Amino acid sequence: MARNKIALIGAGQIGGTLALLAGMKALGDIVLFDVAEGVPEGKALDLAELTPVEGFDAAYAGASSYDAISGADVVIVTAGVARKPGMSRDDLLAINLKVMEQVGAGIRKYAPDAFVICITNPLDAMVWALQRSSGLPPEKVVGMAGVLDSARLRYFLAEEFGVSVEDVTAFVMGGHGDTMVPLVRYSTVGGIPVPDLIRMGWTSEERIAAIVQRTRDGGAEIVNLLKSGSAFYAPAASAIAMAESYLRDKKRVLPVAALLDGEYGLRDIYVGVPAVIGARGVERIVEVELDRSERAMFDRSVAAVEGLVEACLKIAPGLGK
């Protein structure tokens, strides 16, 4: 049986890490695409040469022409300008919007049946633009944000409680930015809700509030430490988890940026929500109950995303048609 084909648009730090993880997880053959001459070919060759060492069979190829992604089962988009110190995700809007329009056109022509995962920031606006530009069904175009933000929250909680990350569940809703909504009430350690652990004296509300804020600042913290570039290991692993759930029909419940169609009282907007990811893409959106405070935070996050989309439409009015 033919192996799946995974196309990675952008061969930078995230793209290279995606290619490594996809191969090691035996998800399929990998094509790295990048406009930088020689870079995708060089990384593909380097990766191909590690396959005998790691003992897996995957074909790696690099290209600077969109026809190389023809027939891809999964397309993961990282193309665009990365954040620099002092730069917000929103500062990237005008530059990366043009990139999404070009990438969307390439996907529409060469990989119209693919499951598309967008990583490019500002995430919620870029995945919206990518879906509009590609014309693919909304359930086949998602953004990677919530898996990463939730992983950061889980890691910080595991550190706080001195337990394995495997025993911590948590998820983050809303936009991928300063207004994201880490849901402490739905976070657990070994099945025990974090609010109960606060009452048991394991931690304090103040320490959990600090963890919530650190989660919101997670990307910026790494950007400031690196001085040049942004996070790439955890974002790549998060996108691969989404791709694996689709390719293997695992039906994992993952927080992703999905297009809402009435869920949470919203329509025609991409925002982070828990969803079932299987062979049909986004198979179901999970509507969790939000209390008044959580809903207020979620609404603020949605408003921030709506502002970005409006800014996109001013730059590229054609996307609204």
From Swiss-Prot:
Group of enzyme by EC: oxidoreductase
Binding site for substrate: 83, 89, 121, 152
GO molecular function: L-lactate dehydrogenase activity; L-malate dehydrogenase (NAD+) activity
Biological-process GO terms, alphabetical: lactate metabolic process; tricarboxylic acid cycle
Catalytic activity: (S)-malate + NAD(+) = oxaloacetate + NADH + H(+)
Catalytic residues, chain numbering: 176 (proton acceptor)
Enzyme Commission identifier(s): 1.1.1.37
Record flagged with keyword Transmembrane: no
Record carries keyword NAD: yes
Keywords: NAD, Oxidoreductase, Tricarboxylic acid cycle
Source organism, top-level taxon: Bacteria
Binding positions for NAD(+) per the UniProt entry: 10-15, 34, 96, 119-121
Role this protein plays: Catalyzes the reversible oxidation of malate to oxaloacetate.
NCBIfam families found in the cross-reference section: MalateDH_bact, PRK06223.1
Family that this chain belongs to: Belongs to the LDH/MDH superfamily. MDH type 3 family.
UniProt protein name: Malate dehydrogenase
Organism: Xanthobacter autotrophicus (strain ATCC BAA-1158 / Py2)
